[in-house]
Amino acid sequence: MGKDSKRQEIGQRIRKAFMGKLFLLMGKSASGKDSIYDHLLNVSELGLEKLVLYTTRPKRAGELDGREYHFVNEETFLSFRESGRLIEDRAYETVQGLWRYFTADDGKIDLQCHNYIAIGTLESYEKIREYFGKDQVLPLYLEVEDGERLSRALLREKEQKNPNYEELCRRFLADCRDFCEEKIAESEITVRFQNQDRTTCLEAIESYIRSVLY
């Protein structure tokens, strides 16, 4: 390798080291992702910006457009795809029809200047990591014992204007497949955060993020 090539390689490594990070919060349904996400965004010391994903599913009680997700229609999804700005997408056949979740390069992501946090899945993590680079995209994987998780999901569903227990059961079973140990290993996720106790879990996640950023 010549001197110029070596200098360029070193320069690329330095630029990568000083680029921002995108932390992707993952876990099965009712594992506490939304609560953890909201808390981390409000820790000023971490300075995380929100990366809001898109979905075509209906809003749930208490959700706001632009906070949990950008709630859009099928036409918006197709527009992103046709313009080549679709980073990743997932489609789920639910009891209420087809629901899409996707990440789009909408001009609001600047890893040169900011660190971000988003909520996703193993599938979206792999595609976002491929798009932005392995060094820039880091997983935050939450775990909760299945019985506790189901209890939380039932309580949350009861608060909805029109509870949909059939969809709750579908999500619960789908999570067992989507977040199986084989897929977790394939995604190279080695650090997990137990969310049985919220305070302890938050302390562990904050400590990890600080170790990465500082």
Role assignments for model-derived ranges:
Residues 2-11:
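N-terminal pre-Walker A segment at the start of P-loop NTPase domains
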Residues 25:
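Hydrophobic anchor at the beta1->P-loop junction of P-loop NTPases
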Residues 28:
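P-loop (Walker A) phosphate-binding loop of NTP-binding proteins
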Residues 31:
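ATP-binding Walker
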Residues 34:
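Walker A/P-loop
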